[in-house]
């Protein structure tokens, strides 16, 4: 599983010119799901996301989490994070999870995040326009793969 986490002052996602998700201060998270991922990876990633300390404290040090600042998350499914261009110029997505299973795991991630902070989401399988104001900019990539 792979997360691209961007600290934002605001973000929104549109499908067919309709806003389907919108947040203020928090994270825009691009979520890539690998074909071998399970809820075990998802739980690890959500825990890491909630504890990640990239918001400034009173001394302007990145020391606060999304929960500390009562921030929001906009979660965007993005299978292209597992695009492999090692052998070709056209990406292969063979490492990405199949859509039906990936959608279930994406929804699981959304529900688990929502239990902790206000969470909005993109539309799985749709062509989306994502707008954000990246604050800092701060962008963190988090990856986790368990060896079974």
From Swiss-Prot:
Chief place of localization: cytoplasm
Record keywords: Cytoplasm, Hydrolase, RNA-binding, tRNA-binding
Enzyme Commission number, as recorded: 3.1.1.96
Substrates-to-products reaction catalysed: glycyl-tRNA(Ala) + H2O = tRNA(Ala) + glycine + H(+); a D-aminoacyl-tRNA + H2O = a tRNA + a D-alpha-amino acid + H(+)
Cellular compartment(s): Cytoplasm
UniProt entry tagged with the keyword tRNA-binding: yes
InterPro entries in alphabetical order: Daa-tRNA_deacyls_DTD, DTD-like_sf
GO terms under cellular component: cytoplasm
GO biological process: D-amino acid catabolic process
Residue positions of motif Gly-cisPro motif, important for rejection of L-amino acids: 136-137
Pfam annotation, one family: Tyr_Deacylase
Molecular function (Gene Ontology), one example: tRNA binding
Keyword tRNA-binding: yes
Function: An aminoacyl-tRNA editing enzyme that deacylates mischarged D-aminoacyl-tRNAs. Also deacylates mischarged glycyl-tRNA(Ala), protecting cells against glycine mischarging by AlaRS. Acts via tRNA-based rather than protein-based catalysis; rejects L-amino acids rather than detecting D-amino acids in the active site. By recycling D-aminoacyl-tRNA to D-amino acids and free tRNA molecules, this enzyme counteracts the toxicity associated with the formation of D-aminoacyl-tRNA entities in vivo and helps enforce protein L-homochirality.
NCBIfam families: D-aminoacyl-tRNA deacylase
Entries under PANTHER family matching the protein: D-AMINOACYL-TRNA DEACYLASE 1, D-TYROSYL-TRNA TYR DEACYLASE
Free-text note on domains in this protein's UniProt record: A Gly-cisPro motif from one monomer fits into the active site of the other monomer to allow specific chiral rejection of L-amino acids.
Quaternary structure and interacting proteins, as annotated: Homodimer.
Family assignment from sequence similarity: Belongs to the DTD family.
Protein name: D-aminoacyl-tRNA deacylase
Organism: Methanosphaera stadtmanae (strain ATCC 43021 / DSM 3091 / JCM 11832 / MCB-3)
